Amino acid sequence: MSFSRTSIYLRLFSFIIPFSSSIFSGTNFPAMDIFTSSAHMSMGGAGYLKPSPLSSGINPSIHGGKVFSASIIKYPADVVSQNIGISYPFKNNTFASFSVNHISYGLFEGYDENLISTGTYNASDTKISATYGRGIFRLPIKLGVKSSLYLSNYGDHSFNTFSFSSGFSFRVDEQKITLGMSIHNLATNFSDLTVDFYPKVVISGSKSLKHLPLNIFLDLTSEDRSDVTVFIGGEFDINKNLQFRLGSSNRKSSQNIKKNTFSSIIGATGFGFGYEEKDILINYSIYMFGTGALSQSLEINIAI
């Protein structure tokens, strides 16, 4: 790629950043942003440009070849996320992926307006997603779209939601840099319940360092142009089989309840390891909240 073409891409990207940050505002439906990938959780939420058929936090134009993935994530308060996904490339520089994510919020005691017990009930969300993407001719640019159907059940209340995400990415091979932009959670609700949804704009970048076996990921997300969340994470190849990941975000301040110095420092931070043997990659991750609570995740990826 010539320097002039690289300059054009970077100028286009710098124009999109200030424009996109002013499009939307609001607070989103929590189930749309919960961790579903162990690798992304280990980087504290960074890695929108890291391929995963499981992750809810990924640019739809990104894919990682033929792979089947499954993960389980244990959150505080007995909240459990179970996820499976598959991605597959096709001819003509196209790919598709499919995933199912189930989140169980546990068992709750129900009460009527007179505070009389009505028994227990389960609360859960199930998301079914399909993604399609392709390259643009011979250019280093990829486009992708993702559609998701949410099936939510909260005792006597249930509702169905359809959401749509799209994104593009391009790679500058000489500098080993990938840049991308995506818009997530364009949603509509198919029920009598009123639920507010607000799209999220994400600006992402990743770089493979030249003299270190390290990939760095930087993501800026916004549902309100005055409130930007910054995620930064890294993936370090210790050797050909072992990986170490670490990441955090400026959510440290919002999660900081000043419980103690240690919790304030490590809040909103994730770390984890990956071990790869032949066609199998196993990831284990921990995410630490500012309250001192922990989430743990185990994930397996199988090349097919």
Residue spans for each PLM region:
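Subset of outer-membrane beta-barrel
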Residues: 24-304
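Cleavable N-terminal export/targeting peptides
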Residues: 1-38
